[in-house]
Structures are given as C-alpha cells and as structure tokens.
A protein has these predicted regions:
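Glycan-recognition surfaces in beta-rich domains, encompassing non-catalytic CBMs
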Residues: 45-143, 151-152, 165, 596-598, ...
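Solvent-exposed loop/turn segments flanking beta-strands in beta-repeat/beta-sandwich domains
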Residues: 92-94, 553-565, 646-660, 754-764
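Ser/Thr/Pro-rich, low-complexity mucin-like regions
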Residues: 141-174
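Secretory targeting and sorting signals
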Residues: 1-40
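Secreted/periplasmic proteins that engage bacterial cell-wall peptidoglycan
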Residues: 328-397, 464-467, 479-489, 728-737, ...
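Basic/polar, cationic surfaces and motifs that engage anionic cell-wall
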Residues: 2-17, 163-251, 256-340, 382-393, ...
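Short beta-strand segments within Ig-like beta-sandwich modules, predominantly Fibronectin type-III
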Residues: 569-576, 660-668
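Conserved aromatic anchor
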Residues: 546-554, 639-648
Length: 822
C-alpha cells in the first residue's frame, strides 16, 4: 500500500489556501496567528454545527545561534504551547524552558523544561514543504503570558513558541454515529460518477526507499540508547522482510486488482468504516475545487470481528475543523497489526472536562507544524474517555503520524498526560512531573486494542512483523522486518522514552485485558433475600437466590456473563453485571459463573456449593415453661421458657413472638420473661433457618400466687403490714424450727420472701424431702423475691414446707407466700 506520498489528497498548497482562507493573520517579526474552525456538536453530522474558534499564535524567539529567548510578555489567551522550528529533520540539541502566567491569578508558573516531540509522520509526510519540527506540547491551562529560554550548542533555525487557544466547546460524551461514515446509498452519486484526480489516480505506489532525500540523524533528546522492551521480545528482532512474523496478516499484493465500487452502506453497528465522499471532502466556503475521488486502490473494509467498537467521542464531537486538515482521504495500510501506546507528555494537571480542548490543541499544533492531520489514531484521557484521532474511519487501518518508520499497518493510541517517573529509560530532558495512569485509562486503551487487533486476527498478547519505512530512524534499519509485541510502547519502535515508565509498565496489563480471557472470575456470594448465608464452605438459600461475582478484568472488556447451576446455564446478563437472580430446586448444587471476554474467550469460575433448603426447622424439645427467680408482682411473675430448635443446615435466628416480641440468638434454648398472675399466657416462638424457612411453637402457662396466710404454721409467726408485700401483708419468724407448709397442685413452684442484711435462712422441703437451705441475707433490701423454684414435667399435688434455721445473730425470715404454675 502507499506511504504518505500516495493517497487521493489535495496538494499541500491547496490545503494551505483553505487554511489561510479560514482567517490567517501574519504578524511581522513575531510569527503567525492561525484561526481554526471547529464543530462543537456531540458527534452527529447535524446541519449547521456550532463553531469553536481555535487559534495558534506563533511568537519568534530571538538571540544567538546558541541561545534564543522570548522575554516575559503578555499574550492573547492560550492553554497549550509548544516550541517549533523550520526543519523537522533537525533535532533540538539543547534545552527549552518555558513559564506561563495564569490568566486567572496573574501568577507565573515555575520554569518547565520541554522534552522533544517524538510522535512523527513517516518521511513522505514529514518531508513535505512547510513541515516543522517541535517539542512536546505543554498544557498550561488558561494563560495570558509566556517566557521562553532555549539553550544549545547550535539551535535550529526559525524557533517560535506556538500558543494555542482551543476555544470553548466539544463533548466528552461518546457518540459513535455510523451514519457519518456511510458510503453513498443507492441513487446518490458514486465515486465512478466523479472525475479522477490525475495527480493520484495513476501514480505508482511509493515506498520509503523511493525517497533519496532521507538521512540518518542522531536520536532525539528523549532517546534511550536502544529501543528495549521490558517483556519478551526484549527488543525488535531483525528478520527476513518477506516473513510476516507470528500473529500477523500477510499484506495483499499492491498490484492486485481492486474494485473501486464501494458497498452501498456502512454497517450500522460498526462505526468508523470508510468515510463518505462528502465527509472526506467537506464543503468549505473558501476551498478551491478539488476532484473528489475515492482512495485507489480502495482499502478493504475491515473484516467482521466479535469485538464491538468501544464508545468514543467522534471528531465532530470534540470539535475538529475538517476544513483545516488535508482534504480527501488519508493513506491506508492493509490492516492494523500492532498498537503503539504513546503519551502526549502535556502534564496531568488537567480536568477531564478539558479533554476536548486538549485534543483540539494537539490537532492545531500538528496542523501548524505542517502535518496533514492529527497524528494519533486515538486519544484517551485519565477518565477513560476515548477520542477519535486522525480522519479516515475509526475502524480503518489509517496511517497515522505517531511512530516514525512504523506508521503503516499500525495505529497509535495517545494517553493524554505525562507518565514518566524519570528513572531508568525515562529521559530527564523534560521536568514535567509524571503520574501513574488511571485504571480507567488503562482499560480504555485495552478496549481499543481489543477492537482494532480483533479485526486483524492478531492476539494482543502475540507479536507482529512490521517493516521499517524510514532511513533515519535511530536503532532501526530501513527495509528490515521487525518483530514487535502486538501491543508495544512507542519506545519499542522509535528512540524515545514514550509512553513513560509508568504507562509502559502497564502494557502487560493492557495486553492481558485486550486479549482475554477474563481474569479473576470468582463467585463472591450466593444471597438469600436477607443476604449471604454460609454453612461451612458453602451457601444455603431457598429456591430463589442471587449469585454475585467479581472479575479482575474490567467490565467494559466483557461482553457478558452466565450463571451455571450444576454445569447448565440458567441466567445470562451483560458484561457490566456483577449479579443475577436464579431459581434452584431443593437440594445440593454447584454454582459457577462463566464470564465472556469481548473477544469471545471465556473463563469459568471455581464452583461453590449451594444448598437450596425448603425444609422448615424442627423443635426436638418442645417448649415448656417454669417459674423463675426474680421480683414478683401480680402483673408479672418471673417465668422461664425452655426449648430446643434444630435444622439440618443450621438456624439463622430465633425470636419470641408472644406475649412480647424479643429477638433471640440462633443458639438460644431459654427465654426468661414474666406472666400476669391468674391469667393464662401463651408463649410463642419462631425459628428461622439459613434459607429463610420458619417454624413456630408455643406453650401456655398460668401462674397463681398463694400467700403465706394459706399455709399451715407451726411455731411463732408475726404478721407484717406494708405496701411492699404481696397483698399488703407478710409473715415473719425468728423462732428456730418454726415452719409454714403449703399444699398445692401445679407443675412448677417458687418460694417468695423478703431480703435484708439482717435476714436469716430457711430449709425447704418438698413432699417431705429436704431440698436445700436458702439464706436470705442481702446487702440491699428487696421485697417479693422468688428465691427458689422447682418444676415437674406435669401438674400434680405437692407440699412445700419452709423451716426457720434460726441463724445466729439474724434468725428472722419474712415470707410472702409461693407462686404455682399450671
């Protein structure tokens, strides 16, 4: 295929006239102000798009051959700058430092050293008349003042500082409009209806070796000594040029007959195919008549791929002035065999809302330096927003201006920002502080690589063979084929530190993300409606559950996920989903998640065990109720409810439901509460198992108070009166062996007494048998205390007898009767 020398484009002067007509103002002695026009719509080809005015103001540096300066001065508003010079083949052997003044605060920035600009078109485009060399750009933000110092042994001629005002407008919302790339439909004028351009239609295809003017200069300031790769292959390996290398697509013969009849329409689901004639040749009021011809030979429409195009902001979306670029179609390669990752080296001090302005600024600088268009094929900001770069159809193998000598059959993705760490392979020519690339940026780069390499059938983790197309690229030999990683850093194809150590270190991640299969796929939980419930190493649910999972591969690189139950897919969801509801039959199951990469490759998680439990809990020990210890009154007699609940898979919770509600633990077997005297009380319980199944149980009891007056007395007893006593009275005795005997029928009994520091002790007999001795001594006085209880499995007639012990120094005991439960 043709290099930058070919293609159906207008001659350089023709585009230049269009540019000048857009509003160029020549400033004597200081440079040129170039006004650009840019649309600010959201990516559709709407009629009458708004205009975003973008301008480049060039100010000349003056001084000696080894020192050029621009004194601190006020300027028109700008946000980006770069320093450029006349000959792009001459490297700036020296240091360029700039500082800018904030238009918001009036404060001057610190001095910043600019590195060399290392994204370049191939020789045919670079060596056109009027093309300039330049430094890396600097995003300064809103500014209205600048100062520049350039020092070196011999500085290039024609040094200027180029100040870019990108205007306001553009969108950060992806809007892929396939209609903007549609081919002429039936009934419209086709390429064969138009005259062909004699300058291009019959021109033989050019190769880099056809240009005798190429030379071999030394590397740029940012060059590393060898273009090494941190992962295999360690460096590009020379091989016979006829070999395509692993994972490559052999190029078609340039002499093969190619039909010029395009398809009638573009794929509605695959944006960015060959642009229409009206898009390639925009209607510009000042443009001279240019024959509108399709590319010849017509590039093949990219093959279909499972990988869908990622969302991206179109050129119209970010505000590209299509009348400023070279009119017509760009040059095309055969297919994209390799992706080169770059950074713009413009600093990271930007907001993502600035990204359209940054892209327009880079576009303006590249045009100002004489390039036919923006050099990069795509740009990505730190928020992960993707911007379409060079015109020609995002899906097409557009030859960019990004990796000198290897622009054909590759594409360049530029990460907006600076990602150096100034160690190892990073050049220290620039003092711009680098940062680590964001996860969103790495993900977006991976997404583009997956799409573009997917159309070529090249694995992102594989390699491709590219042939060096420049005679003067340091470290590479013209005409030799080199094996490159399918996802490479700019430094692997050119002597530069780009894309910076911090981004370069992420290329293995990019390869893995782009190639698939999904990594880190695992089930994180299987939830019941109230959340996940574990039982041992597995989960317990009912017949409905929610399966949740995670992956280390970002969601935008997944096309979908499935939940497998016992190996069968039961739920399919989008790649962005991390959960799905499922229905299960009763019993034990295995659950897995299968995630699908955009490439179609899949990964199935390890299985987790899930038991769908539909069986209610049981009560192996039915509830029973007994009298308990504590303070007694007619409204509340202490009782204790006892039971045992169980479930094959385990209990989640238990609760009391009557006569009062109370939350109990899953392991509870008793519940102390109270019951109203002389009233039948129902004590209700609920047990809930891990799956949410419930069971209920209850028991009913009626407590009755028998006062001391109902007992048979022996010895001396004294009646005491107080509102603190049950019924207002109690009986006391300090006589040793004095006794009270109650006869009752019931299943539980409690003896009630008063306590004080002077209280004595009693012996308790049931049915004539000594049960225990109870000492009533207490540091604090307490009335109506159930001090001792005894229960039976069923109600029967019994006797309870208390006998005064006659404790030395404190013989007196006071009793308030007994409580009986039936």
């Amino acid at each position: 295929m043709r290099t930058e020398a070919g293609g159906a484009r207008a001659p350089r002067g023709r585009r230049a006239r269009t540019w000048l007509a857009a509003g160029t103002v020549l400033v004597a002695g200081t440079g040129a102000v170039v006004a650009l026009r840019a649309t600010s719509d959201t990516g559709t080809a709407a009629e009458g798009p708004q205009v975003v005015h973008t301008s480049v103001d060039s100010l000349e540096l003056t001084g000696s051959a080894g020192e050029r300066v621009l004194a601190a001065r006020s300027t028109k508003a700008f946000r980006m700058l770069a320093v450029s010079w006349q000959d792009p083949g001459v490297r700036l052997d020296g240091t360029v430092r700039v500082r800018t003044r904030s238009s918001a605060t009036g404060t001057w920035s610190d001095w910043q050293a600019l590195g060399a600009g290392d994204a370049q078109p191939d020789p045919a485009e670079r060596d056109r008349a009027g093309v300039r060399g330049g430094t890396a750009p600097l995003w300064a933000g809103p500014s209205d003042g600048v100062q520049v110092k350039a020092d070196g042994k011999t500085l290039p001629k024609g040094l200027t500082v180029d100040l870019v005002d990108p205007g306001k407008g553009g969108s950060t919302t992806p809007a892929m409009d396939a209609a903007a790339y549609a081919m002429p439909a039936d009934g419209e004028e086709t390429p064969t209806d138009r005259p062909t351009d004699p300058e291009t239609s019959s021109a033989p295809e050019q190769t880099p070796s056809d240009d005798p003017a190429e030379s071999t200069p030394a590397p740029t300031d940012s060059a590393t000594e060898t273009p090494a790769e941190s992962t295999p292959p360690a460096s590009p390996t020379a091989e016979p040029s006829q070999s395509t290398g692993a994972g490559t697509t052999a190029p078609a013969s340039p002499t093969a007959p190619t039909s010029t009849a395009p398809p009638t329409s573009a794929s509605p689901t695959a944006p960015g195919y060959l642009p229409s004639l009206s898009a390639a040749y925009p209607s510009c009021a000042s443009a001279s008549a240019v024959p509108q011809t399709m590319p010849s030979p017509l590039p093949a429409q990219p093959p279909t791929t499972k990988v869908p195009a990622p969302p991206f902001v179109t050129r119209a979306g970010w505000g590209a002035d299509e009348c400023a670029r070279d009119t017509g179609y760009p040059d095309y390669g055969h297919t994209v065999k390799a992706v080169f990752v770059h950074h713009t080296d413009t600093t990271n001090a930007y907001s993502c809302a600035d990204s359209p302005s940054i892209v327009r600024s880079l576009y303006a600088l590249h045009l100002h330096q004489g390039w036919r268009d923006l050099g990069y094929n795509f740009l990505v900001d730190k928020c992960g927003t993707i911007f379409e770069g060079r015109f020609g159809g995002a899906a097409m193998p557009v030859i960019g201006a990004q990796t000198y000598g290897f622009n054909t059959d590759s594409m360049g993705i530029a990460a907006i920002g600076t990602y150096t760490d100034l160690t190892g392979g990073d050049s220290k020519a620039s003092t711009i502080v680098g940062a680590a690339p964001s996860q969103a940026m790495v993900t977006a780069i991976s997404r583009i690589a997956a799409w573009k390499l997917g159309m070529s059938g090249v694995s992102p983790t594989g390699t491709s063979s590219l042939t060096e197309g420049a005679k003067d690229s340091y470290g590479f030999t013209f005409g030799k084929a080199y094996t490159m990683n399918a996802v490479s850093g700019h430094r692997n194809g050119f002597a530069t530190d780009c894309p910076g150590n911090q981004l370069y270190a992420k290329l293995d991640t990019v390869r893995s993300y782009a190639a698939g299969p999904p990594a880190g796929v695992g089930v994180t939980s299987v939830d019941t409606p109230s959340g996940p419930v574990r039982s041992g190493t597995g989960y317990v649910t009912g017949t409905t559950a929610t399966v949740r999972w995670s992956t280390s591969t970002p969601a935008s690189l997944l096309s979908g996920a499935e939940v497998l139950v016992d190996g069968t897919s039961v739920a399919k969801v989008a790649g962005t989903a991390t959960s799905a509801p499922v229905k299960l039959t009763s019993g034990r199951h295995t659950v897995q998640v299968r995630a699908t990469h955009v490439s179609g490759r899949t990964t199935t998680s390890a299985a987790v065990t899930v038991t769908a439990d539909t069986t209610r809990p049981t009560y192996p020990t039915a509830p029973s109720v007994q009298l308990g210890k504590g303070t007694v009154n007619t409204a509340g007699v202490p009782v204790t409810v006892s039971w045992k609940a169980a479930d094959d898979n385990g209990l989640r919770s238990q609760a009391a439901t009557s006569p009062t509600a109370k939350t109990l633990t899953a392991t509870s077997t008793s519940w102390p509460t109270t019951a109203k005297s002389a009233t039948a009380t129902k004590f209700g319980l609920t047990a809930t198992d891990l799956a949410g199944n419930t069971a209920t149980a209850s028991v009913t009891g009626t407590p009755t108070l028998l006062q001391e007056s109902s007992a048979k007395a022996t010895g001396t007893w004294t009646k005491r009166s107080s509102s603190s006593y049950l019924g207002g009275y109690s009986s006391s005795s300090g006589t040793k062996s004095a006794s009270l005997t109650w006869t009752f029928k019931g299943r539980s009994v409690a003896w009630i007494a008063s306590r004080a520091s002077t209280s004595g002790a009693v012996q308790i007999y049931v049915d004539g048998t000594l049960q225990t001795t109870v000492d009533l001594k207490s540091a604090t006085t307490a009335y109506r205390q159930a001090m001792w209880t005894k229960s039976w499995s069923s109600a029967a007639q019994h006797t309870l007898k208390i006998v005064v012990v006659g404790t030395s120094g404190r013989p007196t005991v006071t009793t308030d009767g007994i409580a009986v439960l039936n």
